[in-house]
From Swiss-Prot:
Location (main, coarse): membrane
One Pfam family this sequence matches: Peptidase_M48
Gene that this polypeptide is encoded by: htpX
Keywords from the named record: Cell membrane, Hydrolase, Membrane, Metal-binding, Metalloprotease, Protease, Transmembrane, Transmembrane helix, Zinc
Required cofactor names: Zn(2+)
Name this protein carries in UniProt: Protease HtpX homolog
Length: 287
């Protein structure tokens, strides 16, 4: 099985360059001291998130560890996929919710955890479940948690500096008092630009995990079928639109909120299900 570390490194590099440029531009308003403290806070938060990503996500979903006796099919599938990829066996969890979804978390394969909801276990057959688990394991093998935290750290710096710009513009404490429009522009467009980059990277991660997972299982159409069921299931039984759950939504295999929910749109980091299905079907057609 061939993963895509080069593609992930390229995305990380582009992300660093683009967001770092924004940081330099925004930080130039205040000088080195403000830039230093904004960077320190944002990086600190995301380093903590990186090392505790599994705990944060599992806690938000009220997930419980399961044994092989409790979830024999899930264990068998994950063990087969991990063995085929020459990777260690992750910890397995189940979240007792009707919302059909799954996610993987952990900073590397040795610290990985995979969680399925009871809802997804009820609606998928074994072939589809295998495809979903292959997708989730691919996120771990592709080091997507690292990319998310890099994006989060840089976006956090930009947002913090933009907030400073707004505050300074309000109270007139910036040395750029001659151009208040520049402050307004920076405070508004900085966070928007950071969000756009984060969403682009996140959507790219989902496409990549679809492809890698389909290659791991050898069954792209099973994942396409699973995505159809999950999409319909989410509309019938979405997760409640709570901020704690929204902060972990990017880890899910599909947007866990009902289409049209304000919070679902605000925190959506997933490409359209139809596009993902189309790409998977193209993989089969191109064989």
């Amino acid at each position: 099985m061939t993963w895509h570390p080069q593609a992930n490194r390229l995305k990380t590099f582009v992300l660093l360059v683009g967001m770092s440029t924004l940081i330099v531009v925004v930080g130039a308003i205040f000088g080195r001291t403000a830039l230093f403290f904004a960077t320190l806070v944002a990086v600190g938060i995301n380093v903590y998130t990186y090392y505790n990503s599994d705990k944060l996500a599992l806690r938000a979903m009220h997930a419980q560890p399961v044994s092989e006796v409790q979830a024999p099919v899930m264990y068998r599938i994950v063990r087969e996929l991990a063995t085929g990829a020459h990777q260690p066996m992750p910890r397995l969890y189940i979240s007792d919710t009707n919302a059909p979804n799954a996610f993987a978390t952990g900073r590397n394969p040795r610290n990985a955890a995979v969680c399925c909801t009871t809802g997804i276990l009820e609606i998928l057959n074994e072939r589809e479940l295998r495809a979903v688990l292959g997708h989730e394991l691919s996120h771990v093998y592709n080091r997507d948690i690292l990319i998310s935290c890099v994006a989060g750290a840089l976006a956090g710096v930009i947002t913090a500096l933009a907030n400073m710009a707004m505050w300074a513009g309000t109270f007139g404490t910036t040395r750029d008092e001659e151009n208040p429009f520049a402050l307004l522009l920076v405070s508004l467009l900085g966070p928007i630009a950071a969000t756009v980059v984060r969403l682009a990277v996140s959507r790219s991660r989902e496409y990549q995990a679809d492809e890698s997972g389909a290659m791991l299982t050898g069954d792209p159409l099973a994942l396409a079928s699973a995505l159809r069921k999950i999409s319909s299931g989410v509309q019938a039984a979405p997760l409640p639109p709570e901020p704690q759950l929204a902060s972990q939504a990017h880890l899910m295999i599909a947007n866990p909120f009902r289409v049209g929910d304000r919070i679902g749109s605000l925190f959506s980091t997933h490409p359209p299900i139809e596009d993902r299905i189309r790409r998977l079907e193209t993989m089969v057609a191109g064989r």
